[in-house]
Amino acid sequence: MPIRVPDELPAVNFLREENVFVMTTSRASGQEIRPLKVLILNLMPKKIETENQFLRLLSNSPLQVDIQLLRIDSRESRNTPAEHLNNFYCNFEDIQDQNFDGLIVTGAPLGLVEFNDVAYWPQIKQVLEWSKDHVTSTLFVCWAVQAALNILYGIPKQTRTEKLSGVYEHHILHPHALLTRGFDDSFLAPHSRYADFPAALIRDYTDLEILAETEEGDAYLFASKDKRIAFVTGHPEYDAQTLAQEFFRDVEAGLDPDVPYNYFPHNDPQNTPRASWRSHGNLLFTNWLNYYVYQITPYDLRHMNPTLD
């Protein structure tokens, strides 16, 4: 899928070097088709890196995807140039009267912060409430899953004693579910979180369908039956080096982190890690775009009624 982004976005050259089809706005304007409009609420500190990761996963289908980047934190960023944010990100006020086919809400390093202490917690709640009437399907990732479960279902914050970091095996529970179509019976995916997602808790509080979980009974992938919302508790978008960068950052900070599980060859941080989750990550996002967005969204977004009979 050619993703349509502003001509000057750094991800254009970065992804083209990987042979990813990126269509700039100037080129896309000559095609007489309606692209899918996908809004990405980027909550990660290193926004450019996160843009690259998600845009890579949104690029594997023949339809155009028109990407809009959203920010809700007005504080000065320590990790992303202000010029980049001003040039490529919109504020909520800019898009609140628009409709979108899809919304992705990224993770955030807020696992040990209480919800009400999050600087932009009111804005998160505002976006989720707005999305009910303005977005066909929303995909929540990692910390955003925990936030959405609290806002939408009243599930209290669940925090692990130790950070979960590494590459873990998961198994699918419903082999014919659309979101897991084409998945192997078991697959690997990276995690980096303090948030805890016991499958039993989600079943007790919600009517969400759990589609994949770990051998320990932690929910990994689940969704509403009407396909309006989907949740992935890990980080299928991560690059091969992302967990290593987080590990060495914590080492330098004197935090004495555990070596990420099942990640470095021979469990030795001096060895170069390899990504073992790329095919799963690509298939997950392709399925979401196809079955949860494209097949149920209206052609004319002005007539949005994002429900599935």
From Swiss-Prot:
Name the PANTHER family on file: HOMOSERINE O-SUCCINYLTRANSFERASE
Lineage start = Bacteria, Pseudomonadati, Pseudomonadota, Gammaproteobacteria, Enterobacterales
Q: Tell me the leader sequence span.
A: none
Its protein name is: Homoserine O-succinyltransferase
Q: Consequence of mutating residue 235 to A/N?
A: Lack of activity
Outcome when changing residue 249 to K? 4-fold increase in Km for L-homoserine
Instruction: Outline the subunit composition.
Output: Homodimer.
Q: What is the effect of changing residue 142 to A/S?
A: Lack of activity
Q: What is its EC number?
A: 2.3.1.46
Class of the enzyme per the UniProt entry, highest EC level: transferase
State its role: Transfers a succinyl group from succinyl-CoA to L-homoserine, forming succinyl-L-homoserine. Utilizes a ping-pong kinetic mechanism in which the succinyl group of succinyl-CoA is initially transferred to the enzyme to form a succinyl-enzyme intermediate before subsequent transfer to homoserine to form the final product, O-succinylhomoserine. Cannot use acetyl-CoA.
Activity regulation reads: Inhibited by iodoacetamide in a pH-dependent manner.
Quote the cellular component terms of the Gene Ontology held in the record. cytoplasm
Where in or outside the cell is it found? Cytoplasm
Q: What is its main location?
A: cytoplasm
Tell me its family: Belongs to the MetA family.
What factors induce this protein?
Contains two transcription starting points, P1 and P2, which are 74 bp apart. P1 is under negative control by methionine, whereas P2 is independent of the intracellular methionine concentration.
Tell me the superkingdom of the source.
Bacteria
- Site note Important for substrate specificity applies to 192
Name the pathway it acts in.
Amino-acid biosynthesis; L-methionine biosynthesis via de novo pathway; O-succinyl-L-homoserine from L-homoserine: step 1/1
Keywords for this entry?
Acyltransferase, Amino-acid biosynthesis, Cytoplasm, Methionine biosynthesis, Transferase
Instruction: Name the SUPFAM superfamilies for this protein.
Output: Class I glutamine amidotransferase-like (SSF52317)
Q: Which GO terms describe its biological process?
A: L-methionine biosynthetic process from homoserine via O-succinyl-L-homoserine and cystathionine
